[in-house]
Amino acid sequence: MIARNQRTRVAVVYGGRSSEHAISCVSAGSILRNLDPERFDVVAVGITPDGSWVLTDGRPETLAITDGRLPEVSAESGTALALPADPGRRGELVSLSPAPAGEVLAAVDVVFPVLHGPYGEDGTIQGLLELAGVPYVGAGVLASAAGMDKEFTKKLLVAEGLPVGDHVVLRPGRANVTLDERERLGLPVFVKPARGGSSIGVSRVSDWAELPAAIEAARRHDPKVIVEAGIAGRELECGVLEYPDGRVDASTIGEIRVAGVRGREDGFYDFATKYLDDGAELDVPAKVEDDVADEIRRLAIRAFRAIDCQGLARVDFFLTDDGPVVNEINTMPGFTTISMYPRMWAASGVDYPTLLAAMVDTAVARGTGLR
């Protein structure tokens, strides 16, 4: 299909049904601004909070946080469309309204699913794209699902001999942590939706009396909750990138510092600190010894491979007195103007347009189907 013209046509898909809808929009705005127009013909597709797909004008300025207001895709943002799950119509974006319904609005070569959270980063849209035979940026169905679910991420990491923090999983119907588990976890603990991100629904619990409210807050976003032991250590991150030839590389290390910054003493990198109030210091590169940085890069690639990831990921660590501990794997990390993933690659000598081009080229080279 790419022979149709000299530029690869990329559908940037954003928004979605998860509580991370707004952050997906912001990430998409940054990507739309930085995809090389000499190489890529870009189509912007928004997904509303209730799941409707619309062809939008893709203006980055409409996808920014402005005066604390979060962006959102609405049905009025553009023309309603669908992507048929039919390899015979590969890459066609078909009009649903207005008439004539069924008109092909655009045909794309590859999809860049800039979707964070459930119904996007969890293998669901990846499965649709596999059915439709359309190449896509990022992890496949298995790695997306495993990376989204903190319980199964940890299971796979442990199976590969990688260090993870202690935790307890609360499935639907279970509303508390036993006395033995409390003794084992200690305080503080962090209570999180098991399948969520951007610190939405996350609470720091420093007294067990606070636990029921924290579980309730997490369950507003996911019926499955994970309670993680607080880990004393520095918060470090590393980007992983796969190239079209299958080579996998790890970026310069970054560090997030919250405790003591602008009066914050709890060290909690929450949603507001990430996106609204400039309440964290982001150090890229992190001030760590070379041997520590090398070890974290090795562990990041091992974690990437442990969940059978493809394309890209950001791996989050705690650096403790006993060494690094893997916290999470993000198979579609944030791409906002302050996001660590593009900043770490920029510090590694890979600028933003080059980074995005590598991701798209890798997706096209990989294709779809069993591999």
From Swiss-Prot:
Residues 154-361 form the ATP-grasp domain. Binds 2 magnesium or manganese ions per subunit. Belongs to the D-alanine--D-alanine ligase family. It is found in: Cytoplasm. Its EC number is 6.3.2.4. Cell wall formation. GO terms for molecular function: ATP binding; D-alanine-D-alanine ligase activity; metal ion binding. Pathway: Cell wall biogenesis; peptidoglycan biosynthesis. The lineage of its organism: Bacteria, Bacillati, Actinomycetota, Actinomycetes, Mycobacteriales. It catalyses: 2 D-alanine + ATP = D-alanyl-D-alanine + ADP + phosphate + H(+). This is D-alanine--D-alanine ligase. Keywords: ATP-binding, Cell shape, Cell wall biogenesis/degradation, Cytoplasm, Ligase, Magnesium, Manganese, Metal-binding, Nucleotide-binding, Peptidoglycan synthesis. ATP binds at residues 182-237. The gene is ddl. It is an enzyme of class 6 (ligase). GO terms for biological process: cell wall organization; peptidoglycan biosynthetic process; regulation of cell shape. GO terms for cellular component: cytosol. Its cofactor is Mg(2+); Mn(2+). Its main location: cytoplasm.
